[in-house]
């Protein structure tokens, strides 16, 4: 029977419609926004070192987000922060803003906010006392920039939602992390350890996002290694190895994926905009000699944004390197050594002649922490590029999510009994052990504490009791942890530690993300992943199979320190001593995640659970504000204090320095802008920005001549990259000064020109 042409066209239309829905079943959007924050005076979050005060920028911090949505159904949001961890109060305020914008579209259920665990970002943005002691309390600038950056990254992702596909790939990266507590890991059952080749997880899982018309738009990956390539004495804001990897990959993609990824040629996307000058050195020097340093002068506040290299108006490729179960994983891969003798540290306690302060891990670039950051970042970047280029497994299936708040200070947990059967035990109010104060080999503590201490000592117990003496029930519950700080029961001036924690599952087809509010150790993460994967497969083998990918997103939605296995907890190294809720903490997580998984499989709605507190109105800040900025008589803000040498020539790999009279960076955070720019002279006599303070090759360093001085200076260091084009360059500084009456004025100044050959 003949088919009429209109009917044939209608059938063809339906087939094409079905095909398009099959090929591009998701809407996908990505976004990215600056969260660098105050680059001066603020204590850095991570090492709890009160002397580690920000004084410049290594490269900028960002919030990177993706949204994956069913066209007429569920959607999930994942935000990766170049920050030490997520914060409960940040999450609360972000969700409030999203509700004001979008109603119930984005809520605590389907939004995950995760930190990469850099130890080189401004602190003071968490709400619990324990985590803001060294930052002199709450720092409003740190908090505001993170909240705003997360919101803006999600807004960008929402506004860029378009039909697309997501692909997943995974592979092993072997040399970017080592176990920093191997004696603790060895306390896990031998039969369990025998299932794994390594004592840390080596697998990176990457998701590649592809727009149906525009092509690749981003990638997010999860891999476990600590953000501690930068040391506890570093004072420059840095995304550490994961932030560096993200910068490298975004530049690699924006540069057309053509640049080599060798260690000598970190990808740059901007060199192609510079005209290739003659290689005649004398001619270039003659040109450079005509451009002397400029006097400091007032500029429009937005000029630093307009002249930055990575223009915010352009569609971005967003690449995020997310954290996983990194609890006992160090990027300092050369091992741990005593700084006085050079000998390896004690295996069980990580001490040197009984002192923890002398035992440090060495990164692959030792003794250069910036080089270690580059190497570990580059390793992750190269692995991600390989997975990105070979990603062919398409994510297909439902979008789903589950979320619950739980009171971990008093949770009933069912555990097996030694003689068979089971019994119900409880988690404990939060407490930290003596081993916590010893620190780790990435950042040792002080005094006479040591890891692996399950006894404590009389003197420090007396000191502890001044704050709070733990009761007998708490002591029994936390055993064998000797309690140093009973933080869960300390409530003055407000809560010292969290009790109510969020747990969350996000599903994108065969990818399942377990959002956890802390740092799982390697084996703890393996147990959780394996338990939930097995549970999902057994619950619905048609919907879930062995081909599913389960990843842990660490430090997500809030922060509650560490989660060690029962056996690791017994050893009481740093990770066990920092497992707040007692020896059954991991079992509690597995139990409660199974409840989320049950709800995910059956499409159930779980009770919301007890609400975490909003302590914003109770916060105390002791950080003094900027009072006034000044310069010596006859000097303007932005004037050059120390210029580049006259008629100077630099080769690739050499460093160029210029120092300017400046104001405090807290006056203007230069969000989505830059304090420092390297400009090149283009044909026609126009200067074009080619590097800024978001580049790995450039460092912005700020200092005062004395602690209470109102004068300050900014030194900009540029190590000429291998990819730099020969030509005439200069260094420009942007800043802001505060008058005695409180007004803020923006300024700029530039160095004399110099030649790169």
From Swiss-Prot:
Gene3D superfamilies: Neutral/alkaline non-lysosomal ceramidase, C-terminal domain. Glycans are attached at residues 311, 348, 657. Residues 1-25 form the signal peptide. One of its GO terms (molecular function) is N-acylsphingosine amidohydrolase activity. Keywords: Endoplasmic reticulum, Glycoprotein, Golgi apparatus, Hydrolase, Lipid metabolism, Secreted, Signal, Sphingolipid metabolism. Its main location: secreted. Transmembrane segments: none annotated. Its EC number is 3.5.1.23. GO terms for cellular component: endoplasmic reticulum; extracellular region; Golgi apparatus; membrane; plasmodesma. InterPro entries: Ceramidase_alk, NCDase_C_sf, NEUT/ALK_ceramidase_C, NEUT/ALK_ceramidase_N. It is found in: Secreted; Endoplasmic reticulum; Golgi apparatus. GO terms for biological process: ceramide catabolic process. It catalyses: an N-acylsphing-4-enine + H2O = sphing-4-enine + a fatty acid. Pfam families: Ceramidase_alk (PF04734), Ceramidse_alk_C (PF17048). Hydrolyzes the sphingolipid ceramide into sphingosine and free fatty acid. Belongs to the neutral ceramidase family. This is Neutral ceramidase 2.
């Amino acid at each position: 029977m003949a088919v009429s042409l209109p009917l044939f066209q209608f059938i063809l239309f339906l087939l094409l419609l079905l095909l398009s829905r099959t090929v591009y079943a998701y809407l996908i959007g990505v976004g990215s926004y600056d969260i660098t924050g105050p680059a001066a005076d603020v204590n850095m979050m991570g090492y709890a070192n009160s002397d580690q005060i920000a004084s410049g920028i290594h490269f900028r911090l960002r919030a990177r987000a993706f949204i994956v949505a069913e066209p007429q159904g569920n959607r999930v949001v994942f935000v990766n922060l170049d920050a030490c961890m997520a914060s409960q109060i940040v999450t609360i305020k972000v969700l409030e803003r999203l509700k004001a914008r979008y109603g119930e579209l984005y809520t605590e259920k389907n939004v995950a906010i995760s930190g990469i665990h850099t130890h080189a970002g401004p602190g003071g943005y968490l709400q619990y006392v324990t985590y803001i002691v060294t930052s002199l309390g709450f720092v409003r600038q740190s908090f505001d920039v993170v909240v705003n950056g997360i919101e803006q990254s999600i807004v960008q992702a929402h506004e860029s939602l378009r039909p697309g596909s997501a692909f997943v790939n995974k592979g092993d990266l072997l040399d970017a992390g080592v176990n920093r507590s191997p004696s603790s890991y060895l306390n896990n059952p031998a039969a369990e350890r025998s299932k794994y080749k390594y004592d840390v997880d080596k697998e990176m899982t990457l998701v590649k996002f592809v727009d149906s018309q525009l092509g690749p738009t981003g990638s997010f990956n999860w891999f476990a290694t600590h953000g501690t390539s930068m040391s506890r004495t570093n004072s420059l804001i840095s995304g550490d190895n994961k932030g560096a990897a993200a910068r490298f990959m975004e530049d690699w993609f924006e540069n057309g994926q053509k640049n080599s990824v060798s260690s000598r040629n970190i990808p740059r996307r901007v060199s192609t905009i510079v005209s290739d000058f003659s290689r005649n050195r004398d001619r270039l020097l003659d040109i450079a000699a005509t451009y002397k340093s400029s006097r400091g002068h007032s500029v429009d506040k937005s000029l630093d944004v307009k002249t930055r290299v990575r223009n915010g108006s352009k569609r971005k490729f967003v690449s995020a390197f997310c954290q996983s179960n990194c609890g006992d994983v160090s990027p300092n891969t050369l091992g741990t050594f005593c700084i006085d003798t050079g000998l390896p540290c004690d295996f069980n306690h990580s001490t040197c002649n009984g002192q923890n302060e002398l035992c440090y891990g060495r990164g692959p670039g030792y003794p250069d922490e910036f080089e270690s950051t580059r190497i570990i970042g580059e390793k992750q970047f190269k692995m991600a590029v390989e997975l990105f280029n070979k990603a062919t497994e398409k994510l297909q299936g439902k979008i789903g999510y589950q979320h619950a708040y739980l009171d971990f200070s008093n949770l009933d947990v069912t555990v097996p009994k030694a003689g068979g059967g089971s019994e119900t035990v409880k988690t404990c109010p939060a407490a930290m052990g003596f081993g916590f104060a010893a620190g780790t080999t990435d950042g040792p503590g002080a005094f006479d504490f040591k890891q692996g201490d399950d006894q404590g000592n009389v003197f420090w117990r007396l000191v502890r009791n001044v704050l709070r003496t733990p009761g007998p029930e708490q002591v029994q519950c936390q055993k064998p942890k000797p309690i140093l700080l009973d933080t869960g029961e300390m409530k003055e001036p407000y809560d010292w530690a969290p009790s109510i924690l969020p747990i969350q599952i996000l599903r994108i087809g065969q990818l399942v993300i377990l959002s956890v509010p802390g740092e799982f150790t390697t084996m703890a993460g393996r147990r959780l992943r394996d338990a939930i994967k097995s549970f999902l497969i057994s619950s619905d083998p048609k919907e879930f199979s062995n081909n599913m990918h389960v990843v842990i997103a660490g430090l997500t939605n809030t922060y509650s320190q560490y989660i060690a296995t029962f056996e690791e907890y017994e050893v009481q190294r740093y990770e066990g001593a920092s497992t707040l809720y007692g020896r059954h903490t991991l079992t509690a997580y597995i139990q409660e995640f199974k409840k989320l998984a049950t709800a995910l499989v059956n499409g159930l709605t779980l009770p919301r659970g007890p609400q975490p507190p909003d302590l914003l109105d109770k916060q105390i800040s002791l950080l003094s504000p900027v009072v006034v900025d000044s310069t010596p008589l006859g000097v303007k803000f932005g004037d050059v204090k120390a210029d580049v040498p006259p008629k100077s020539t630099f080769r690739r790999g050499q460093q160029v320095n210029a120092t300017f009279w400046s104001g405090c960076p807290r006056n203007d955070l230069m969000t989505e802008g830059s304090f420092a720019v390297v400009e090149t002279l283009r044909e026609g006599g126009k200067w074009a920005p080619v590097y800024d303070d978001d580049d790995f090759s450039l460092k912005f360093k700020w200092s005062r001549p004395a602690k209470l001085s109102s004068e300050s200076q900014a030194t900009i260091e540029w190590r000429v990259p291998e990819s730099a084009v020969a030509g005439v360059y200069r260094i420009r500084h942007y800043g802001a000064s505060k008058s005695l009456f409180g007004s803020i004025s923006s300024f700029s100044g530039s160095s004399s020109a110099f030649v790169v050959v």
